[in-house]
């Protein structure tokens, strides 16, 4: 396994670690600035992965669920993020020495793009939960930064 693939795996586990710490009812929490609720943020993360897989390697889409707004559950999100995470991992693993179709400049930048995009949404999720009076516990807050144990 390459360092890039391992980095992606850690990042995906952190997304799921956060999701597991959120009560199902709080998936509907919304930040003061509106936009997507917590569940829709996680759904967006999954669906953007699918969008990129469709461009870069459509064969990796087989069996991957797109999460629609009216079908958001914690279980569905965890399953979808695990499955799409494995597909992105495979895409990165197969592209380490080269390029990702439809993305410039290379696979390392693609990984950086994904981690930046999804971390941005993790921040929005944390803010929405806090502003709604449902912040995740302190152990989880610190745990998001413990890449060496995730």
Regions found by a protein language model. Name each.
Residues 1-2:
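Short, low-complexity N-terminal intrinsically disordered segments enriched in polar/charged residues
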Residues 54-55, 59-92:
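Helix-adjacent hinge/juxtasegments
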Residues 91-104:
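Acidic catalytic patch
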Residues 5-19, 24-66, 103-150:
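Short, contiguous alpha-helical
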């Amino acid at each position: 396994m390459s360092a890039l693939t391992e980095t992606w795996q850690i990042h995906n586990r952190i997304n799921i670690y956060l999701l597991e710490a959120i009560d199902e009812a709080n998936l509907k929490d919304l930040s003061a600035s509106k936009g997507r609720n917590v569940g829709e943020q996680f759904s967006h993360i999954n669906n953007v992965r699918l969008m990129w897989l469709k461009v870069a390697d459509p064969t990796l889409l087989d069996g991957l669920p797109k999460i629609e707004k009216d079908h958001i559950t914690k279980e569905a999100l965890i399953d979808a993020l695990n499955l799409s995470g494995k597909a992105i991992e495979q895409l990165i693993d197969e592209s380490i020495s080269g390029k990702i179709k439809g993305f410039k400049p290379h696979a390392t930048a693609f990984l950086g793009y994904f981690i930046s995009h999804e971390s941005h949404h993790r921040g929005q999720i944390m803010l929405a939960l806090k502003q709604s009076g449902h912040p995740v516990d302190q152990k989880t807050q610190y745990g998001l930064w413990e890449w060496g144990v995730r």
